[in-house]
């Protein structure tokens, strides 16, 4: 018996907006609605190809993303916003302009930032019941 696993890869534009769950009013499949006065952390990866792999679990099929992404160096006051894995929603766009939302309020992405000398590292881990692509 073979276990076939297909990995989907999609190129995302070089702007990602990261919201902590506590900043959000609502999240739909195509829109992130922040609470009044809340703004996301915006990061700029050089190039971003997200890899999504299906994972069959006892509870059903999940789509997993586990990546560390180099991003432009953040100001120190922004880099410390995610020092440990933090439940978050990530919003970006693919190259056709369609919004890509990673994480849901029920299954948020776990996000943290690792400071480095030249570039910071954005660590993302998420399992979703529906593919964001």
Give the positions of each predicted feature.
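Solvent-exposed edge beta-strands and adjacent loop segments
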Residues: 2-68, 107-115
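Short beta-strand and beta-hairpin "edge-sheet" elements
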Residues: 42-47, 91-132
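Oligomerization/assembly interface segments of phage tail-like spikes and tubes
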Residues: 54-77, 117-130
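Surface-exposed, low-hydrophobicity beta-strand/loop segments enriched in small/polar/acidic residues
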Residues: 74-98
């Amino acid at each position: 018996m073979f276990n076939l696993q297909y990995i989907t890869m999609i190129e995302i534009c070089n702007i990602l907006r990261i919201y902590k769950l506590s900043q959000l009013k609502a999240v739909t499949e195509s829109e992130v609605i922040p609470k009044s006065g809340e703004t996301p952390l915006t990061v700029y990866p050089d190039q971003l190809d997200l890899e999504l792999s299906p994972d069959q679990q006892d509870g059903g099929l999940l789509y997993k993303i586990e990546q560390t992404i180099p991003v432009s160096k953040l100001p120190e006051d922004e880099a410390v916003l995610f020092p440990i894995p933090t439940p978050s929603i990530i919003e970006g766009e693919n190259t056709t302009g369609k919004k890509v939302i990673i994480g849901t309020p029920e299954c948020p992405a776990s996000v943290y930032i690792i400071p480095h000398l030249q570039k910071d590292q954005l660590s993302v881990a998420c399992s979703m019941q529906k593919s964001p692509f």
